[in-house]
Design a protein with these regions (language model features):
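Non-catalytic, usually N-terminal nucleic-acid engagement modules in DNA/RNA processing proteins
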Residues: 1-74
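Catalytic cores of enzyme domains
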Residues: 67-213
């Protein structure tokens, strides 16, 4: 069984990498008894697109954000189909399916799955920080009952880096990630959306600031 788990892991990781995934990890999942593994995938955002952001989201970033989510959904679907052809069950969770915008919650937390799967650690900005790419990534998750080896969470943090705190237009980011102010953040997102800077509740300023350690 151990060899099967390792082989399955290697097959999925190769497929994901071939499809353009920049980071891949697996963790145990206990919230659904019939799907006990969670596969976390991440793709990189365009640095050139992010460089266009100054003090507000841009139309270009808004479209790029949607493109990234669409690509992740396609990749997650292809990985899920691969798993099903192998005789197992798979549930691709959309990259951006918000249940509550104000609390910034979804069907499940891609960020928590990514943390447990060793993709990165929770940053002060409430985003996952990848060791190389920082927070300039987007995430998706595939739940499955395929036997898979698992990864370990990274034992790292943001250290002395406070770039996201310095640039946050809402002052929502604090010294501790646990003190991140969701309400103030969302109020600023609503302002940006009302001003039609972007047709969705997004910002991108802290994403641009967090470009890896």
């Amino acid at each position: 069984m151990g060899m099967d788990k390792k082989l399955n892991y290697q097959k999925l990781k190769k497929l994901a990498t071939d499809l353009g995934v920049a980071a891949f990890g697996v963790c145990d999942f206990t919230e659904k008894k019939d799907l006990n593994s969670a596969v976390s995938i991440a793709i990189r955002l365009s640095k050139s697109v992010l460089d266009e952001i100054e003090d507000r989201p841009t139309k270009l970033y808004f479209h790029h954000y949607r493109q990234a989510n669409g690509l992740l959904d396609q990749i997650a679907m292809r990985i899920s189909n691969f798993i099903q052809f192998d005789g197992y069950n798979a549930l691709p969770v959309p990259a951006s399916q918000i249940v509550d915008w104000e609390k910034q919650t979804a069907y499940l937390s891609h960020k928590k799955i990514a943390e447990l799967a060793g993709i990165g650690w929770p940053g002060r900005s409430n985003l996952i920080v990848h060791p190389e790419f920082g927070s300039q990534i987007r995430l998706a998750t595939i739940l499955t009952d395929m036997p898979l080896s698992t990864d370990r969470p990274l034992k790292k943090d943001c250290g002395k880096c406070k770039r996201c705190i310095e640039v946050c237009p809402a002052a929502a980011i604090k010294e501790s990630q646990k003190d991140f102010d969701h309400i103030i953040c969302f109020e600023k997102l609503k302002f940006f959306q009302k001003q039609r800077y972007a047709d969705q509740y997004i910002c991108g300023i802290c994403v641009k600031a967090c470009n890896g350690k």
